Amino acid sequence: MILVTGGTGFLGAHLVYQLSQKQDAVRVLYRSADRFEQVRQVFSFYTDQVEALFQRIEWVQGDITDIYRLNEIMQGVDVVYHVAGLINFEWRQLDRLKKTNIEGTANIVNAALAHNIKKLCYVSSIAAMSTSPQDSDLEESLEPIGVF
């Protein structure tokens, strides 16, 4: 079975559709059902059988910051695509961003290790890069330690 976190996001929904076309069962971890309509819209770009496809997928509610729930959800999973994450450029959201994007990702990795997951694919975005002007230029010296 394949588990996708963040399957109700833009990229995640496209990934869920593509994975659902394979023969493996797909389980999607979602935080809130209010994004299901957006997932249906993405599926409608690919097929007229949106509801049939939607029903074939196992949708499980949870949060990547809840390690106990993750351990339940990882049961029977072989492959994890970790697409979940928050994007926000406001400093007042920094604690929430860290909790989800850092602690949540650590929880995914630890749960995957605990359940002997065969493959973990982590997806990030350009939002992981800083937009701070002082970080825009980087100067480094390259000092190779050998010819290889």
Question: What are the functions of these language-model segments?
Answer:
Residues 25, 94, 100-148:
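Conserved Rossmann-fold NAD(P)-dependent oxidoreductase catalytic core, especially the SDR/UDP-sugar
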